[in-house]
């Protein structure tokens, strides 16, 4: 890009609205040498200072002087903790995806499911942005579209207090700036393949069968000017396809429609059918085991992943002050999650699909050298589907009985997982921001943002079809339960969100201050039961029989008719509440016999349901940086941070159905009236340069978290119980981070950080209280603060890179951390706790990742041959343990378990490969640049 500015009489100048990246800045003045400064790094929301030592010359045009800029070790306008990772840094790291990069940042950890946690918060408390646009799926708080590492220009992770322009996050902000095209053509293709090389064949089935095609990746990018448009229009395009069979495998010994019988007390009478036997069966367990030894069954990947990601950006520089761009991201992910019980029947497991798309037109207009605005629009669609067969009436679905009858410690010898989930979130966004450097001291930024969501959701369980009399049809035929059933939920909701903010960056000689505030408005556009003791939309307890003339609800609680202008309003004699037709408009009342009451039967003035409340929140924030020397600065930040509830918790169980069972607890409901979750965050930190090449940073932080989502228990008129989400959970996080940044030369760099952190709360999951009371035996929900499930108290990260120019290079990442907590039990299957919740720790975890490359040139092209090794030492890190022993390789349950009614042994059942981290993975590849 070519942008510039004129200085004032003091030589002061500003250049605003530069995209993050690396630049060359040139200063010229009549009577002085021209000075060019190269390798100037520009980062998001940071001020980069470039001074020019001009020397006078006799001639009007003197010799040009070139200076190479060094990235400052101390960023003096830093007022909170953040990490910046540039595209050249990513290229040198042995990393695969965005999560691998995030995990290396101080205060960031990943749990056993791979979810990202920043400074001890829940995984849904992180905001993800691409080019200033949110790509966080509001249903579950996850990333809605994947961005390939090769398409990232700069990544910023804010783990401390963030400015007022950032909202809907409690723990941190991950902001990605994507690449855009330049004035010259640039492209490249990378191909690599690999597999797992591990000695842990006693844990991972068939891991010693090395297949170089088990992992394959191909990606490429191309950028430059669009032909016929000169340098006004440029483009960037990137594509990636990734296919990994995974490291957890099963054996195709049984097919979903196989049916075995293990009911006989004598295993000599068991009838066993596997995939090689067709419709015939072998009688007797030992006879079958002898037969199976003679057969070779197929290996089937059970945690495979396929990804396709596409990225593009078209940039049109209409004038020197006006730029218009359109960016697009598309990702398609197909994966499976390992289910140990299906190890011998892997074809019966469901598949999961994630599809994301975002399109973002952006107009940037510089009104003057000191003021510009951006106008952004975005269309984002995220769809998540989970099923075995897309058609729920697919005849390949079988009776759930074929899984093996649910025998204890037995692998499934047939059957299918019959759950279906399909949800789609569409977001329309408009955003307007203005930035103005009103003087040398103050940079004002303000903005408005509007979002309109549409959420479509449906989930059900494929069940056996029934005839008109309600009898199950034999043989099995798949069917969808009626919408009024407990195992079928469907809804469409259209919430809206609006926000506004203003912030001022005050740069004084003595200090830098970031101060601001934001206002957030959210309307869930949901409905809530008027009376929580009778919430059901499809089957209310207090149904009525108008025709009988009785003045009692179905549960014998009195009501009265209240004539008003000839209408018939129903008034509850106990509460005085008036009721009309329930919402939505297609819902009905029924009488005691189950007959539908039509509109003509009665008219009313009250309401069985009420609309949810809108929420407004104000968040003040301040950050201060105080330079103590020319090589050091102290910073402090304090702020209030709010986040709306995820849609999952707002709208769960939209018909408010209750699974009746004589007072037992079996139902959980959403709550469209949930309040915003709240965090008060403060931190204080020190940046210090030591010598010429070493930087030290120390940060202490504390977070007080309340209004988190939990569950409360409610009893109905019919003495049934149900749970619903409410704002009652709480927690706190405190810790210290120490980081060393060593940069002795351009060839070598090393970064080391250590985090001591304690994350505590009364619950790790919004469902915790619900699950506690449903346990056998039930237990009281936790009210004291205990370590959270992802609490990782000690974390040490090391990132070392060495490159000999562009010839060859090495990279090493080391990670060491204490294990996460678990709750000890006397016996895992009994669920009786032997101590407090999360009172014990899993073993220490250690991992090394390695990368090496060698550059080659021939035929006018540049090539790079590289190798990446993940888990270099093939460590068996435990990510889960048996709660009865705290060990990953032994459970005391095996001492008390009876004979397995199935074809597997107890040892096979209690060998849990899913309890271990990924074994050693080796990838070899080639990059061609042109």
Which ranges hold each PLM region?
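C-terminal beta-signal and adjacent terminal beta-strands/loops
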Residues: 807-811, 815-829, 845-847, 854-930
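Periplasm-facing N-terminal accessory domains of Gram-negative outer-membrane beta-barrel systems
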Residues: 1-64, 68, 73
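Gram-negative outer-membrane beta-barrel transporters
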Residues: 693, 697-711, 716-825, 927
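Membrane-embedded beta-barrel scaffold of Gram-negative outer-membrane proteins
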Residues: 64, 374, 378, 627, ...
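A beta-strand signature from Gram-negative outer-membrane beta-barrel systems
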Residues: 105, 148-188, 219-221, 229
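Transmembrane beta-barrel wall of Gram-negative outer-membrane proteins
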Residues: 211-334, 354-370, 620
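Short acidic/polar hinge/loop motifs at secondary-structure boundaries
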Residues: 16, 133-160, 202-213, 220, ...
């Amino acid at each position: 890009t070519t942008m510039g500015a004129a200085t004032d009489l003091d030589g002061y100048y500003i250049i605003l609205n530069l995209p993050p990246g690396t630049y060359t800045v040139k200063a010229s003045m009549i009577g002085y040498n021209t000075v060019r400064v190269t390798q100037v790094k520009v980062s998001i929301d940071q001020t980069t200072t470039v001074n020019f030592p001009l020397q006078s010359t006799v001639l009007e045009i003197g010799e040009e002087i070139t200076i190479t800029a060094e990235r400052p070790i101390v960023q003096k306008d830093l007022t909170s903790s953040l990490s910046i990772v540039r595209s050249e840094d990513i290229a040198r790291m042995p990393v695969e995806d965005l999560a691998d990069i995030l995990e290396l940042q101080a205060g960031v950890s990943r749990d056993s499911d791979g979810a990202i946690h920043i400074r001890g918060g829940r995984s849904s408390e992180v905001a993800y942005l691409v080019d200033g646009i949110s790509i966080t799926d509001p249903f579950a708080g996850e990333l809605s579209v994947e961005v390939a590492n090769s398409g990232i220009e700069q990544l910023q992770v804010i783990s401390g207090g963030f400015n007022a322009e950032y909202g809907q996050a409690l723990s941190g902000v991950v902001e990605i700036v994507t690449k855009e095209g330049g004035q010259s053509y640039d492209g490249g293709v990378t191909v690599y393949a690999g597999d797992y090389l591990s000695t842990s064949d006693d844990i991972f089935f068939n891991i010693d069968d090395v297949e170089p095609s088990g992992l394959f990746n191909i990606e490429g990018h191309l950028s430059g000017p669009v032909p016929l448009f000169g340098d006004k229009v440029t483009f960037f395009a990137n594509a990636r396809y990734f296919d990994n069979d995974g490291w957890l495998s099963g054996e195709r010994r049984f097919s979903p429609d196989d049916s075995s019988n293990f009911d006989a007390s004598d295993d000599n009478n068991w009838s066993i059918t596997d995939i090689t036997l067709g419709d015939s069966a072998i009688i007797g367990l030992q006879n079958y085991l002898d037969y199976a030894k003679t057969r070779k069954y197929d290996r089937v990947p059970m945690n495979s992943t396929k990804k396709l990601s596409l990225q593009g950006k078209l940039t049109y520089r209409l004038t020197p002050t006006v730029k218009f761009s359109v960016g697009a991201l598309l990702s398609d992910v197909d994966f499976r999650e390992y289910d140990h019980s299906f190890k011998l029947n892997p074809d019966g497991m469901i598949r999961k699909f994630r599809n994301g798309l975002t399109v973002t037109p952006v107009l940037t207009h510089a009104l003057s050298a000191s003021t510009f605005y951006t106008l952004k629009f975005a269309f984002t669609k995220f769809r998540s589907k989970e099923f075995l067969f897309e058609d729920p009436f697919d005849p390949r679905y079988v009776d759930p009985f074929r899984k093996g009858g649910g025998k204890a410690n037995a692998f499934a010898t047939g059957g299918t997982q019959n759950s279906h989930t399909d949800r789609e979130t569409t977001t329309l966004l408009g955003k307007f921001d203005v930035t103005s450097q009103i003087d040398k001291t103050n940079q004002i930024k303000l903005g408005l943002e509007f979002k309109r969501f549409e959420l479509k959701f449906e989930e059900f369980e494929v069940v056996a079809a029934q005839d008109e009399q309600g009898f199950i049809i034999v043989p099995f035929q798949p069917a969808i339960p009626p919408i009024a059933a407990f195992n079928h939920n469907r809804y469409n909701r259209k919430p809206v969100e609006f926000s506004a903010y203003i912030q001022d960056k005050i740069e004084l000689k003595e200090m830098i201050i970031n101060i601001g505030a934001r206002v957030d408005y959210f309307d869930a556009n949901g409905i809530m039961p008027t009376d929580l003791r009778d919430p059901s939309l499809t089957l209310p307890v207090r149904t009525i029989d108008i025709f009988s003339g009785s003045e009692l609800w179905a549960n014998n609680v009195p009501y009265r008719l209240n004539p008003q202008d000839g209408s018939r309003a129903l008034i509850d004699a106990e509460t005085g509440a008036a009721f009309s037709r329930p919402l939505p408009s297609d819902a009905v009342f029924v009488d005691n016999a189950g007959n539908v009451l039509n509109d003509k039967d009665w008219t009313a003035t009250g309401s069985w349901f009420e609309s949810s409340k809108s929420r407004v929140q104000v968040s003040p924030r301040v950050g201060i940086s105080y330079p103590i020397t020319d090589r050091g600065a102290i910073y402090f930040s304090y702020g209030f941070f709010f986040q709306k509830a995820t849609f999952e918790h707002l709208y769960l169980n939209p018909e408010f159905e209750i699974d009746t069972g004589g007072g037992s607890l079996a139902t959980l409901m959403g709550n469209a009236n949930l309040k915003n979750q709240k965090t008060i965050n403060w931190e204080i930190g020190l940046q210090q340069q030591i010598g010429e090449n070493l930087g030290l940073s120390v940060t202490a932080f504390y977070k007080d978290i309340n209004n988190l989502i939990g569950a409360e228990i409610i009893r109905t008129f019919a003495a049934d119980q149900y749970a619903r989400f409410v704002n009652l959970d709480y927690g706190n996080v405190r810790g210290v981070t120490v980081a060393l940044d060593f940069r002795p030369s351009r060839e070598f760099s090393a970064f080391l950080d250590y985090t001591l952190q304690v994350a505590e709360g009364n619950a790790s999951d919004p469902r915790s209280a619900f699950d506690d009371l449903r346990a056998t035996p039930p237990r009281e929900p936790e009210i004291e603060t205990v370590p959270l499930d992802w609490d990782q108290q000690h974390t040490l990260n090391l990132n070392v890179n060495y490159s000999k120019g562009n010839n060859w290079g090495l990279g090493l990442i080391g990670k060491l951390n204490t294990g996460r907590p678990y709750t000890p039990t006397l016996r895992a299957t009994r669920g009786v706790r032997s101590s407090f919740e999360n009172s014990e720790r899993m073993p220490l975890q250690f991992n090394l990742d390695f990368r090496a490359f060698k550059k080659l040139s021939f035929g006018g092209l540049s090539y790079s041959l590289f190798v990446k090794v993940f888990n270099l030492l093939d460590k068996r890190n435990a990510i889960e343990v048996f709660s009865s022993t705290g060990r990953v390789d032994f459970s005391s349950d095996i001492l008390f378990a009876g004979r397995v009614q199935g074809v597997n042994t107890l040892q096979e059942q209690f060998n849990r490969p899913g309890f271990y981290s990924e074994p050693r993975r080796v990838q070899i590849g080639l990059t061609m640049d042109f």
